[in-house]
Amino acid sequence: IMKVVIIGGVAAGTKTAAKLKRENPNDEVIIYTKSKDISYAGCGLPYYVGGAVESDEELVVNTPEKFTALTGVSVYTEKEVTALNSGNKTITVNGENVSYDKLVLAVGAEPVIPDVKGVNLDGVFTVREPADAVKIKNYSENAKKAVVAGGGFIGLEMAENLMEKGISVTLIDMASQLMPDVFDSEMADLIRRKLQEKGLRVVLGTTLNAVIGDGKVSAVQTTSGEIPADMVILSVG
């Protein structure tokens, strides 16, 4: 009997755990994740903010309890792995050492936070997990102007959903067109014009230099000038 520990509980972690347990039912398979949710729909986060997804519970594909009942995999949420010793095959979880026979790292990516002044102010958010979407939705109830930094899928969807709430949104991106890895310049220009027709302000070829505010955000400083903002969404990668 083998003990397999998986660090990370979203798509890759849960899929790997379920497959390992299915192929080797007698093995002990354990997931540790620092999030409180597992197996959530990241693409749905902006639509929870906009109200199309009504409850944050709808974002969670599987609860830990459901996943364990379904697969036999043990799941520990809000448990952060802080050290790994491959020599003696142990990890440190919340200060305790846990042994393993095989270890799978499925930690995903952390949101990129630009190295600029003011990103820790109230009203500045990244978008990665359901808890982020809940914070953004709550904060947006009192916002009138938002800046979204980053014109990828999540950035565009966040801009769309904030506009649905009646918020005036400016989207900035350092690229000279929207989504250069996906669209050619002609298609990107068509999309930009359509978004502008809907009321989105799009500022391209622009870098975020600083977030301005006293305790909470009031504007952003960019290479194109200062833009007023009650809230800022960082979706730069």
Residue ranges and their predicted role:
Residues M2-S74, N161-F183:
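Beta1-alpha1 glycine-rich phosphate/pyrophosphate-binding loop at the start
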Residues G8-A11, R128-E129, G150-G152:
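Glycine-rich Rossmann-fold phosphate-binding loop(s) that bind the pyrophosphate
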Residues T16-A17, A41, S86, P114-V116, ...:
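Short glycine-/acidic-enriched loop or helix-start segments at secondary-structure transitions
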Residues A12, D37, A83, P111-V112, ...:
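Surface-exposed, flexible loop/turn segments at secondary-structure boundaries
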Residues M2-V5, V60-V147, A219-V236:
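FAD-binding core/adjacent interface of flavoenzyme oxidoreductases
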Residues N26-I30, L70, V75-T92, V98, ...:
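A Rossmann-like FAD-binding core segment of flavoenzymes
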Residues K135-F183, V217:
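Rossmann-like NAD(P)H-binding beta-loop-alpha module
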Residues G13, G42, P46, P64, ...:
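A general structural signal for well-ordered alpha-helical segments in protein cores
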